[in-house]
């Protein structure tokens, strides 16, 4: 893999599974179902978990684009998912729907955490005064809440959320929105993300240097977008920035 020989003047980052580790989210659903069932006679936690998984398999394809582009907010998404889950278990009480969504939201906030290599990198980038932007797909309320809960709001000079602008990765336009607000030319800007299809493909379409954060050591398949640089950890990134 090649990488740009240009000096890095600004960095763009993806959020989920690049900076935020969502591996505990399924656990938060199980815990939520335990808590909901404990307070509601007739509901079984295991059946709630099963129903919730089934609901998401059917419901997510219906609403993914709406949620990503801002036509559906995260709160409404969650309420409807729990409404369908509880109905599948014989519960039609809207107060329980609201309770379930609130319990899961709070547990989901606890489940999100930064990967271990994130804080050190951003401390170094801030010390080096590298302009930073976040480019993330998702509903505004969902993504803004993650930034607030984890204290990341002040980390970025620019934040572009697909649900706020009506454009999503891999559309090159969303990268250009961030680029237009940064004091750097595109040949000096790198985008770092975990997805070949949204991050790498989109960044390359926008003329940026695409850095694939491949934490789990996935093997690219024939025809997959090719990154300009592949790294296994964000701790590897500063070495290139410092050159």
Residue ranges of each PLM-predicted region?
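Asp-based, Mg2+/Mn2+-dependent phosphohydrolase catalytic module
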Residues: 1-11, 22-23, 43, 92, ...
């Amino acid at each position: 893999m090649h990488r740009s020989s240009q000096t890095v003047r600004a960095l763009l980052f993806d959020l989920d599974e690049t900076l935020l580790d969502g591996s505990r989210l399924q656990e938060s659903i199980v815990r939520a179902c335990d808590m909901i069932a404990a307070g509601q006679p007739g509901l079984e936690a295991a059946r709630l978990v099963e129903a919730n998984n089934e609901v998401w398999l059917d419901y997510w394809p219906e609403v993914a684009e709406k949620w990503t582009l801002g036509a559906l907010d995260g709160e409404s998404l969650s309420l409807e998912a729990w409404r369908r889950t509880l109905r599948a278990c014989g519960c039609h009480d809207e107060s329980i729907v609201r309770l379930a969504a609130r319990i899961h939201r709070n547990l989901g906030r606890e489940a999100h955490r930064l990967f271990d290599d994130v804080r050190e990198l951003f401390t170094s980038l801030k010390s080096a005064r590298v302009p930073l932007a976040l480019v993330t797909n998702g509903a505004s309320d969902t993504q803004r809440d993650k930034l607030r809960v984890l204290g990341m709001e002040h980390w970025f000079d620019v934040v572009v959320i697909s649900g706020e602008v009506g454009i999503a990765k891999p559309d090159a336009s969303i990268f250009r929105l961030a680029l237009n607000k940064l004091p750097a030319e595109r040949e000096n800007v790198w985008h770092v993300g975990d997805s070949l299809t949204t991050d790498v493909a989109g960044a390359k379409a926008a003329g940026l240097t695409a850095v694939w954060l491949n934490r789990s050591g996935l093997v690219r398949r024939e025809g997959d977008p090719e990154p300009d640089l592949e790294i296994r950890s964000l701790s590897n990134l500063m070495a290139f920035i410092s050159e």
